[in-house]
Amino acid sequence: MDSRKAMLILGLLAMVLLISSEVSARELTEEVVEKSDEVNDAKYGGYGRGGGYHNGGGYHNGGGGYNGGGGYHNGGGGYNGGGGYHNGGGGYHNGGGGYNGGGGYHNGGGGYHGGGGHGGHGGASNNGN
């Protein structure tokens, strides 16, 4: 009779140990996945303030591009400090660029509206200086 009780207790302990180890493994897996997602978000960006090579990427206030660049709204874009669609830096170096508010190659206004040229001079389709 004592051996049956001992076997029953050992069996119950084995089941508890098995269940707790599976729960621990699941929690560890979820934690690793969360950390991996955080690292990927930091590296490659997303929709808000992320990605690219350096301060890059995204749709809203996104860095994007190679250095400080890119995005659709208030985006840096371009190669260095440039680009975007709305209020975008654009261009190759500190260029205004984009569709609204800028463009050009070097500190140029440029673009479709309020724009630009090659070196801060010249026209666009509307209000160019």
Swiss-Prot record:
Summary of the tissues where the protein is detected: Expressed in axilary buds. Detected in growing stems, leaflets and floral organs, but not in roots.
Region (Disordered): 110-129
Signal peptide: 1-25
InterPro entries named among the record's database cross-references: GRP
Keyword Signal: yes
Induction: Down-regulated in axillary buds within 15 hours after decapitation and then up-regulated.
Keywords: Developmental protein, Signal
Tree of life domain: Eukaryota
Family: Belongs to the DRM1/ARP family.
Name of this protein: Dormancy-associated protein 2
Organism: Pisum sativum (Garden pea)
Gene this protein is translated from: DRM2
